[in-house]
């Protein structure tokens, strides 16, 4: 084997080792993050989270309207996870594409963090619940510590008529002229769970964290331009 090929082989091997080391370090970091929660669980240092979702009354003297079917997920607090969520919200108004894709981006960030917890042997720390017809939800047996609550509710389906340019309408007769979507309302809160105590969280239209559409149907994405053929 020539010296140059030996050098390339060594570089590839080093790059592989670095990548593996980085991946293991990431898992170790997450394992360190969840260790206090697992210790609290083993010591039965547990608390409860009680959530209440509602809409404020539109007129004085009326009762709040309970919000059923609000999904909740409680995850061990992570500054990195929180920063990833903030990044999605910060880019919400950058473009129409960012606005439409925000819900998918939030879900991707959440799922990635949940997978990381499972990989670190802490899948039991991913806690899910939903509010009932009274707008109430309770999560019991939470290890003491800081948690990040992410909650969301999907609204009714809406439609919007689209303007299609004449040339496109003639060329593509099957272009949809209506976009259907639903609005997703998010709440986010950092909560501290203490042993033997119940922490209460209110989810109302006054403390919404983010609102974005989930597109369900509409115009197809434009095809990617084909790269020019290389001349031989």
Where does each model-flagged region fall?
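Short, surface-exposed beta-strand/beta-hairpin micro-motifs centered on an aromatic residue
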Residues: 133-141
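Bacterial N-terminal signal peptides
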Residues: 11-19
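Primarily secretory-pathway and cell-envelope proteins
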Residues: 25-112, 153-232
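A short tyrosine-centered beta-strand micro-motif
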Residues: 145-151
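Short, small/polar residue-rich loop motifs at catalytic or cofactor-binding pockets
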Residues: 123-125
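Short beta-strand segments within Ig-like beta-sandwich modules, predominantly Fibronectin type-III
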Residues: 128-131
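Bacterial N-terminal signal peptides that target proteins for export
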Residues: 1-11
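Extracytoplasmic
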Residues: 116
